């Protein structure tokens, strides 16, 4: 009985070590302009340099010109509707008087970057993903994706130590 208990404790300890040593990391990149802010949040496997998920937050500040606000909302709604039927994609949107926003969550286990049928249905989504998700050696590489978006002006946000 004591041997079983000791073995169980050792196995439980090993399990905690394995869980604690996962190589999953998160990085946030921001591109801010006068009228908009785009944030990419990558969750990736550090050891394999593979992107696991990508969350894109887009916030557009509306001008005081009603026609511009209406056109911006219509364009956002078109883009959101294109994405809704795409597998591995979750889209949410928020409206206020001063800004519109939407969030696109990509689960790389389900999302097919090379799917021509989905690409035809949601061209705006794939135009963005072609910039944010870069393949290298047959997989979506975090380091290649990071290099590409930094070249376009995105700045990595360093996590503050508590």
Sequence positions of predicted segments:
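Bacterial N-terminal signal peptides that target proteins for export
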Residues: 1-9
């Amino acid at each position: 009985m004591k041997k079983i208990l000791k073995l169980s404790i050792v196995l439980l300890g090993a399990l905690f070590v394995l869980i604690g040593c996962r190589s999953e990391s998160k990085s946030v990149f921001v591109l801010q302009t006068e009228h908009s802010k785009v944030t990419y949040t990558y969750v990736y496997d550090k050891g394999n340099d593979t992107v696991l998920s990508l969350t894109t937050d887009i916030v557009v500040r509306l001008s005081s010109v009603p026609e511009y606000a209406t056109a911006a909302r219509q364009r956002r709604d078109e883009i959101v509707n294109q994405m809704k039927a795409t597998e591995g994609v979750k889209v949410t949107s928020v409206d206020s008087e001063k800004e519109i926003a939407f969030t696109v969550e990509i689960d790389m286990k389900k999302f097919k970057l090379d799917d021509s049928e989905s690409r035809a249905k949601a061209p705006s989504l794939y135009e963005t993903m072609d910039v944010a998700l870069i393949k290298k050696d047959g997989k979506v590489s975090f380091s290649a994706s990071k290099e590409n978006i930094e070249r376009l002006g995105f700045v990595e946000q360093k996590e503050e130590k508590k």
